[in-house]
A protein has these predicted regions:
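Phosphate-group recognition and catalysis centered on beta-loop-alpha active-site segments
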Residues: 1-316
Length: 316
C-alpha cells in the first residue's frame, strides 16, 4: 500500500499533467493553478516532508508503538547505578528521572527483622562495616555512610529500607525486587509480600530470587504477586516451574530457543546485566521482554529510538 520515494517524486508529475490541461482548456481555475504552480509544488513538498518528519519523530519516541507492539522494557539495575550509588534512594530517583520502566533492587533482613535494600551479604564494600546483614540490627546500621564509596559527594546517603523505596517509587516506576535470603531470616518473603500489599504495589512489582523456595514462599503468602526465577543458564526444563511467572537469565548464556519455549508457556524473560550496545542489540533480537542494565539511558535510546529517519513515504 505504501512505497518509499524521494521527496516530491510524484508531485511534479501531477503538474506536468497540468501543463497539458492548460493547453487543452481555458477554465479560470486551471489558469490560477497554472500561474501558481511553482508555489503549490514547493508548499506540497514542505507538507509531505513535515508529515513524514512527524511520523518518524513519533515512531522514534515510541508513540507509534503504543497499543501496537510490546517493545522491550528497560530495568535500571540497582537503580541508576551507573551514575548514583547502587541500591540507594538517589539511584531510584535517578531511574525515575531518566524514564526507566523498572528499577531492580536487592532485599535482605537484619537481625531484628527489618527488610533493607542491600546487594552484598556483607556490609563492608559500601559502608566499611565488616559485618553480615543478618548479624546486625537496623539501629546499628541505619546511620552508616552508604554513598562515599561511590563518590564523596554522596557521604550523607544511607541504606534504605524496602518501605522507604516503595514510598519513593509508588506510581512512578515498576520494581523488580530480588530476595536474597541468608539462611538466618525470620520471615523475609512474608514481610515483602505484606509491604507490597500495604502500598498497593502487587501489580507493579515482580519478586525474583536465585532461591526457588523464596518464590514458593512469596506465592504462598500472596499468589497475586508476580515472580521470576533467576538463573545463569538457559537450558534444562525450567519452563514448567510452578512458582515462577518468568525467568531472569544472564545475558551471555541466553538462547533464542529458551526464550521461545518460555514465552509459549506464558513466562516473561528478563535478561541481566546488559551494559554494551552490541550485547543489547543481540538479546533484544531474541525477543525478550525486559532488559536489566546499569545504564538505562543507553538502553532506552537504542530500544525506543532505533535506527535513523527513513525516506519519505508516499501513498501510491
Amino acid at each position: 500500500y505504501y512505497r518509499k520515494a524521494a521527496a516530491g517524486e510524484r508531485i511534479p508529475r501531477v503538474f506536468r499533467d497540468l501543463d497539458n490541461a492548460y493547453r487543452i482548456t481555458n477554465t479560470r481555475w486551471v489558469k490560477k493553478i497554472y500561474m501558481y504552480r511553482k508555489r503549490i509544488i514547493a508548499l506540497s513538498i514542505v507538507v509531505v516532508i513535515g508529515v513524514n518528519f512527524a511520523y518518524n519523530f513519533a515512531d522514534r519516541r515510541g508513540v507509534l508503538h503504543m497499543g501496537l507492539d510490546n517493545p522491550v522494557e528497560v530495568t535500571a539495575h540497582r537503580g541508576y547505578s551507573a551514575v548514583y550509588p547502587e541500591n540507594t534512594i538517589p539511584a531510584f530517583k535517578g531511574a525515575i528521572q531518566v524514564g526507566a520502566d523498572w528499577a531492580e533492587l536487592d532485599v535482605q533482613q537484619t537481625a531484628d527483622g527489618e527488610v533493607i535494600v542491600m546487594h552484598d551479604s556483607n556490609l563492608k564494600r559500601t559502608t566499611g562495616l565488616d559485618k553480615e546483614v543478618w548479624q546486625v540490627t537496623w539501629d546499628e546500621i541505619k546511620d552508616l555512610d552508604n554513598g562515599s564509596w561511590f563518590d564523596k559527594k554522596y557521604q550523607t546517603v544511607r541504606i534504605p529500607t524496602l518501605e522507604e523505596v516503595l514510598k519513593v517509587c509508588r506510581g512512578k516506576i515498576h520494581l523488580n525486587i530480588e530476595i536474597k535470603p541468608s539462611g538466618h531470616d525470620k520471615d523475609l518473603e512474608e514481610q515483602v509480600a505484606k509491604l507490597l500489599k500495604k502500598y498497593h504495589m502487587r501489580d507493579t512489582c515482580v519478586v525474583s530470587s536465585l532461591k526457588y523456595d523464596s518464590l514458593r514462599k512469596i506465592k504462598q503468602a500472596d499468589d497475586s504477586i508476580e515472580t521470576a526465577y533467576i538463573t545463569s543458564v538457559s537450558y534444562g526444563n525450567f519452563t514448567d516451574l510452578e512458582y515462577a511467572d518468568g525467568y531472569s537469565v544472564e545475558s551471555t548464556l541466553l538462547s533464542k530457543s529458551f526464550v521461545n519455549k518460555a514465552q509459549k508457556t506464558g513466562k516473561q524473560i528478563y535478561v541481566w546485566t546488559v551494559n554494551s550496545e552490541e550485547r543489547l542489540e543481540k538479546v533484544v533480537g531474541m525477543g525478550i521482554d525486559n532488559v536489566i542494565t546499569d545504564d538505562p539511558v543507553m538502553a532506552k535510546e537504542l530500544i525506543v529510538f532505533p535506527g535513523f529517519l527513513g525516506k519519505i513515504i508516499i501513498p501510491t
